[in-house]
Swiss-Prot record:
This is 4-diphosphocytidyl-2-C-methyl-D-erythritol kinase. SUPFAM superfamilies: GHMP Kinase, C-terminal domain, Ribosomal protein S5 domain 2-like. It comes from Actinobacillus pleuropneumoniae serotype 5b (strain L20). HAMAP family: IspE. Keywords: ATP-binding, Isoprene biosynthesis, Kinase, Nucleotide-binding, Transferase. Catalyzes the phosphorylation of the position 2 hydroxy group of 4-diphosphocytidyl-2C-methyl-D-erythritol.
Length: 285
């Protein structure tokens, strides 16, 4: 492969998030449902024989060694003793710090894409284990299926939630995930429920009230749009989303978003667009 190939690096949503326990080691146990979207960044890969990893558009102010895209490529290269190199570019559409998985998705697309085109032969499960060192959400994107997660997020079960249309908006604020989980008012004892029960109930997010109480940008945007749709938080934010049965309904509400707010319309995907493109199931071809 010498030509450049463009791979999708999709967004994700946490369709619900419940915190069921705070462990003695400080970690929170949760129940959450991840689903991919047909919207995201693009990663370009151009494989070569140089052995060098070259970033075509580095993030200003971020050292190469701290860039998740570069780290993912080097991790796979070192783990497999691969002698090949690559030029890697990214077209960013997802907001930084939005809670829609941009950085984790980028890292996963690089791992899966380079494993495929370098022909390093790791299974998706091996890649997921490798990717965990880059971030807790990276394995979700590597495995490539919508998933119900429990524990501290490490127990994953493939899931088939409805593939709805969504309006996703990014309030003009950055939210500290650590601060949210340290907040004394955060619910930490929501009763555990079975997946089948959760799928039949209305979904909420235990982090939402804390975030809305502390970040007026989130509270005001949700309140302003309430006359059109009910928006809720994904993860710890800052992005909020509303669910619709049709693209037309989503577009109608999207038209009412404030002009200074970034947002997009997307459809839920239970199989990652990346895995659809590369025709991946349980192991790379």
């Amino acid at each position: 492969m010498t030509e450049k190939i463009i791979l999708p690096s999709p967004a994700k949503l946490n369709l619900f998030l419940y915190i069921t326990n705070k462990r003695a080691d400080g970690y929170h146990e949760l129940q959450t449902l991840f689903q991919f979207l047909d919207f995201g960044d693009d990663i370009s890969l151009e494989v070569n024989e140089s052995g060098e990893i070259e970033l075509l558009n580095a993030i200003e102010g971020v050292a190469k060694e701290q860039n998740l895209i570069y780290r993912a490529a080097k991790l796979l290269q070192n783990h497999t003793a691969c002698s090949k190199g690559a030029k890697i570019g990214v077209t960013k559409r997802l907001p930084m710090g939005g809670g829609v998985g941009g950085g984790s998705s980028n890292a996963a697309t690089v791992l899966v894409g380079l494993n495929h085109f370098w022909q390093t032969g790791l299974s998706l499960e091996q890649l997921a284990e490798l990717g965990l060192s880059l971030g807790a959400d990276v394995p979700i994107f590597v495995r490539g299926f919508a998933a119900f997660a429990e524990g501290v997020g490490e127990k994953l079960v493939a899931c088939q939630p409805r593939e709805s249309w969504y309006v996703v908006l990014k309030p003009n604020v950055s939210i500290s995930t650590a601060a949210v989980f340290q907040d004394p008012n955060l619910p930490r004892n929501t009763p555990k429920r079975t997946l089948s029960r959760l799928l039949s109930e209305e979904w909420t997010n235990d982090c939402e009230k804390v975030v809305r109480d502390h970040y007026f940008e989130v509270e005001d945007l949700i309140a302003e749009l309430l006359q059109y749709a009910t928006f809720r938080l994904t993860g710890t934010g800052a992005c909020i989303f509303a669910e619709f049965e049709s693209e037309a309904e989503a577009k109608a509400v999207f038209a009412h978003k404030p002009h200074n707010i970034f947002g997009f319309i997307a459809k839920g995907q239970n199989r990652s667009p990346l895995h659809q493109m590369l025709n991946l199931t349980t192991s790379p071809q």
